[in-house]
């Protein structure tokens, strides 16, 4: 379970493929300068509907991208809930990208589904 009111960097423990060795645990490193499509999905389990918000932040060397959702609209704690974030990021060679999450308020009961079908990160050079 994640502690509340704390920002956590997410470590992804399974790689489907890594063409160039550009991803390690929680950090994607751009191998060359270009535009990258970056995406992440968080598959939440046991969300506390009394939490103020859940956010997912995609942090690159040049910019932060953020999505925030408020679970207080649920009439009960959802067992499953998904958040995703996508960005086309301008990255220089050796710039990095990481995913951070924060649960504000409520109880420390939420966790992430460990299956890579539900919780994942992807980075791809576009141009």
Regions found by a protein language model. Name each.
Residues 1-127:
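Extracellular jelly-roll beta-sandwich "head" domains, especially the C-terminal globular C1q domain
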